Amino acid sequence: TLNAVSSYVKQFLPDNTIFVWDEKPVYKPNIRKETLKEYKGNRSKDSSPHQNNEVIKSILKTMGINSIFPSQLEADDVVAYICREKEGSKVIISVDRDFLQLVSEECTLYDPIRKKYFDYASFEQETGYKNVDEWYTAKCLTGDKSDNVPGIPRFGAASVKKYLADPGYMLDKSQQEIFKRNADIFCLDKYESLPDEKEYYREQLEVKVEASYKEFIDYCKEYSFERILSKKENWYNLFFMKSLYNKLNDIAS
């Protein structure tokens, strides 16, 4: 994970890096399950892939990287909040196609597995849909198997194409109900109707995380991250030089 973060920071050279986790230190039930109780019921309950999360969070903090969490919602919603509330260009690094709905002139999605960019200019070329609205409509029609959200029965690619091409295409009552339910599940602006959730995100983002090269090296020694230690100068230049420069600027001002 740390090497991946390093490679992305080197690739994109951001002014600020935020790590969003899909876990809940302040737990509240996922409100999407109120709409569909089977939502994500197909996901593995195996916690072993997350056993080192606390160590990773601590090390990220020494690198000046803030960790942000949801409470009632999910990591996707936190990312949506950041993209919509923060000014300037943003790059989301994720394989999750749900983030396609956030693509805009200021927001790009980068898939690190396929090494593909999804941006405003190339959206149709990369997705086959003219714009984000078309993509989102198609998703609401067809559902999402990975999230255990069923779509409209027998509504495949041909039906979606016909629906998008014909403004007069009418869904029947049961189809409308499925579409509306899916739109409610998939939308990433639910935080707008949850003031406490929105405030929770804002408070976390306001926390200033100071990078500490000494603490970073101490962690790397403690956990025998020999590969990082062998290239510690590179890590210093990438994460800690900027922090030192910012501190000097603060003093000067």
Predicted regions and their residues:
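Extended two-metal-dependent nuclease catalytic cores across DNA- and RNA-processing enzymes
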Residues: 41-230, 239, 243-251
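Domain-level signal for Mg2+-assisted phosphodiester chemistry and nucleotide/NA-binding surfaces
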Residues: 1-61, 114
